[in-house]
Amino acid sequence: MWNKEWAAKIPFMTYCEACRPHHWLKNGLLFVPVLICGRAEDLLQAPLWLAFMTFCSVASGIYVLNDLMDRAHDRRHPSKRHRPFASRKLSGLTGVWMCLVLIALGGVCAINCGERLFAITASYVALSVIYVGKVRGEYVLDLFVLSALYTTRILAGATAANIPVPASFLAFSAMAFVSLASIKRLNELTQLRRDGAPDLYGRGYELSDHSIVALICVSAGYAAVVFLELFVQMSSVAQGPAPIFVSNAMCVVVAYWISRAVVQAHRGDMRSDTLCYAVTDGSSLVCILGLALGLVFLMYCRSQSIG
């Protein structure tokens, strides 16, 4: 039962850990529509930041729900067993309350952003619950649902900023996140095979699926690069020899990063989460820096052409 005295003994950081605030970086996807359209001035829009807060809150609620339902499997995992609910630092009842409060708080923020964003947020929560409850145990389907959840963030950002997103970029996003999700699965399978484990706990994959998952990583990743190139060719941001060259170079950088990530995952050298890998791996940071500089250059070129 809930007890205030008992709850007071739980360190505040334990609650924070359960919310996984480091994953809020993924909600930076809400700002992507503004950036790809070269409208940096719209980054200061209040609705956009309110949408960011919305997804931080609901995403944390879903992570809590995920950890609650995955406690049994996490306790058998070498690293996940240290999570707050798996290690029994937080009780199941505490997790239920945290989940409800976080999702409700996100819903309140979404309502203040308008009906369309509320509908997108509600769809995100519903799809997330379906994923946690059923789909994460289904092989391949889980990759596409995860991709849809990430792409929903981009749609939410476009809605909050009132910016249309080209279909070619949405196709790039969908395939890129299928690739990233499969890279994570590939890395997990490699590590389990190395440890002699029989299967991937709580997921629908077997060790014998290792090669086919690697194939999905590569094919989806390169398909994403093709859609990115299509977006570049159709985009008004890349006009003139220099911007077009920079845009194509950015496509090459993305292709290189995906290829390298697949090799790292195939070796089992990647961290369990691709986000941690992207922000800690030296080559990945160089790629991110290069892409950021290229994006700044394209926005500058667009501002000069408008001026």
From Swiss-Prot:
Gene Ontology molecular function terms on file: transferase activity, transferring alkyl or aryl (other than methyl) groups
Keywords: Cell membrane, Membrane, Nodulation, Transmembrane, Transmembrane helix
Pfam families linked: UbiA
Membrane topology recorded in Swiss-Prot or TrEMBL: Multi-pass membrane protein
Transmembrane stretches, start-end: 46-66, 91-111, 117-137, 140-160, 163-183, 212-232, 238-258, 279-299
InterPro entries in the record: UbiA_prenyltransferase (IPR000537), UbiA_sf (IPR044878)
Cell compartments where the protein resides: Cell membrane
UniProt superkingdom: Bacteria
Gene3D superfamilies the record matches: UbiA prenyltransferase
CDD domains: PT_UbiA_2
GO CC annotation terms, alphabetical: plasma membrane
Name of the protein: Nodulation protein NoeC
Source organism: Azorhizobium caulinodans (strain ATCC 43989 / DSM 5975 / JCM 20966 / LMG 6465 / NBRC 14845 / NCIMB 13405 / ORS 571)
